[in-house]
Each structure stands twice: as structure tokens, then as C-alpha cells.
Amino acid sequence: LVTKEVSYTDWESPNKTWDKVGVDVLPGYIADKKEIPAKEAATPAKDTKVIPDETDKVTYTKIGSWIPVDPTTGKDGDPIPFPNDPNDPTKTGEVTQIIPHKDGYTPKDGNGTPLEPVNPANPEEGYKPPKITDPKANIKITYDKDDQKAKVKFVSVDDEGVETPLDTKYNIDDLTGKSGDKIPEEKVQARVDVLKSMGYDVVDNPFDQDPTFDTKKEIDQEFTIKVKPQVSTAKPVYVVEGDKPSSEKLKDAVTTKGNEKTVDETKLPDTTDKVGDDTLTAPVTVTYGSGDNKREETVNVPIKVVEGYPQIVPVDPKEAPKAEDSINPDDYPAGSKFTYEKEPDTTTPGD
């Protein structure tokens, strides 16, 4: 006996047959027999009318349980005992117990078969227990990490914070793993390196925080990496009225981190009658990256049209020329000559 206790019940009969006796249901235990069957009474010994006592034994064994295993520690959790059949001490009864849900995990029986949710639309309500095949044997419930998936998209942001999605070919939609595991970053870093080669600076990268897969297998995680395009700068190019700026001067006027600069000479402006026109520009195309992974930037170089020789730089009377009034002769066409509008007084420091 499980309890190591023996109890006795009177078994009486007014005739020559012992009547059958039902076995009581003991909650939490399974009996080895449902009843004590009727049996013929033994013949009394001579010189006595007393029928000898008859003894029979019923053994109770502790009923089995479903035992959920903690997925984080691997230790057995609180057992969930099988139900007793109220009418048969040798059987288990109607199953109403529920196996608890754990976020990010799927419960499975001893054969590795996933349990059926009580409500498929809401697994958080729990799962139906595995079928009982032996009322005295425990059934372990293991929890396996769910398969998870993550996606990454890339957007370009401007100085005002406005986001523009990059070509979808740079997005990543096949990052997979298990609940709680670190999301693999190899593909993400490779994509970031490509965008850097295309002249983008990373503004915000959530993968710097080593994110992990969440516990919601029905919903893919989504991450957004923000990048900002590098911008080239240009200084003015001076040309004599009627001439066009050379490609080399235009390229030299552009400061960039790009790997190539090109000029479409068919797009160079006509400078005739354009002296003093501050809207005149010439486009220079800057290329970042190469092949299928390249970005082109159009840099509009200011074109300053000047008259023929000599060049005049006005200054205030009795002032040395100011820095902002000075010129770089290298910016002008070869052979240009320069004079002051008025001869400055170099004995008095300028402002």
C-alpha cells in the first residue's frame, strides 16, 4: 500500500455465500480492483456452526500526474494529478484539467507531439492534457521554444527627420531563431556595410543593443535601421563671360567622399550676358559605391561669370582690402589680371 496503512471492513453474510463488496474511491489513488467478488463460504469445522472468516485485500496506488517541466530551469513543476472516476476506483475520470501556457513556448507530450490548445484562437487559455494511457504513470510535459522570425527595413532620413524607404532589395525578411535567443546580426551588418559604401551614415541601428527574439510566434518582429546620405559641397567656379567651365575645374570644385565625379558637358550653362547672375550652376554627378549597389548625387556647382580683363575688386576708401572682398586668382581663367577699384591706404589697418 502506498500509505502503508491497512484498514478492515466487516464482511458478513447470512447465507452460505459471501456477497460481493464494492471498493471505495479514494481521491488521489487508483485501486487494483473495482469490487470484491462474491464467493462461496467455507464449510464450518465439525462441532461448530461458525463459518470461518474470509479476508481479501485491495491495494491503492497513487494516481499519476501531468508534470510540466520548467523550460528555463529544466526542473519539474507542480504536478497536476489525474482525475478519479467517481464510479470506478480503478479508472481515471473525465479530464477537466488544463496545461498552462507559457509565452514563447509550445507544450509537448512525452512523444514530442504538441498539445492542442483549449481555444486555438487564444493559446494563452492553456492546452488540453495528453491522453492517459496508464492511470498510475506520470506524464511529463516539456516546453519547447517557439520558432520566431524578424524583419529589417532601411530608411533614409533628411535633416528634418523625414523618412524615405530605401529600395526594398536592401530589406531583410528571413532572420529566424527561437524565443529569447539573440537575433543573428551577420546579414544585418553585411547590409549596413553595403549602405556605408554607398555613402550613407548610420543614424539609428537597433541592433547595436543586441536584440533578442520575442515570445509572439504569430507576429514577426520588425526593426528599422535609419541612415542618412552623405552630402557633397561645392565652391564657386569663375568663368569669363561667353566661356564654359571646364570639367576638371567643376570636379575640383566639389568636395566629396564619393569615389567618382563626372560631368555631362551637354548640361553646361551658356554664360553669355550672365555677368552677375547668381542662379547659374553646372551639375556634377558624384557616385558612391559600384555595380548594383551605388548611389548617385547631383551637386550643383555655382558658376560666377566675370567680365573680360582686368578684374576689379572694389574697396572702401582708405581701407585695406577685407578678407571677404579678396579673391583667389586660381579660381579665374588663366591670364586674368587684377586691380583695385581704388588704391587702398595700407598704412591704416582695415576692419
Regions found by a protein language model. Give the residues of each.
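Short domain-boundary/entry signatures in modular proteins, especially
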Residues: K57-I67, I141-K151, I225-S232, N300-P310
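Extracellular/surface recognition and adhesion modules
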Residues: L1, G28, W66-P68, G104, ...
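Surface-exposed or flexible loop/turn and strand-edge residues in extracellular/cell-surface modules
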Residues: W18-V21, T55, I63, G77, ...
